[in-house]
Design a protein with these regions (language model features):
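Short amphipathic helical patch at the helix-1/turn junction of helix-turn-helix
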Residues: 6, 17-18, 45-46
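A detector for short, charged/polar N-terminal pre-domain segments
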Residues: 1-7
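Recognition helix of helix-turn-helix/homeodomain-like DNA-binding domains
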Residues: 31-46
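Residues within helix-turn-helix
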Residues: 24, 35, 53
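Short basic helix-loop element that most often maps to the first helix and adjoining turn
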Residues: 10-29
């Protein structure tokens, strides 16, 4: 696992939880399955920039907030 993928996943999970969203909520909004989102949040996935942008939009934040 790359450190950047782990950091991205932690940021997504933190922001999602702050917004009181479940993984199911965000998956439905994005059309993802839970396994895909779980892997991203665990730092096991390597999402494309387009995927990161979709996640950011669903969370109502700028993409760079997820990449910090």
């Amino acid at each position: 696992m790359k450190t950047s993928s782990i950091k991205l996943g932690k940021n997504i999970k933190r922001i999602r939880e702050q917004k009181k969203m479940s993984q199911g909520d965000i998956c439905r909004a994005l059309g993802f399955d839970r396994a895909q989102m779980s892997n991203i949040e665990a730092g096991k996935g390597n999402p494309t920039l387009a995927t990161i942008e979709k996640i950011a939009q669903a969370l109502g934040v700028a993409s760079d907030e997820l990449l910090k």
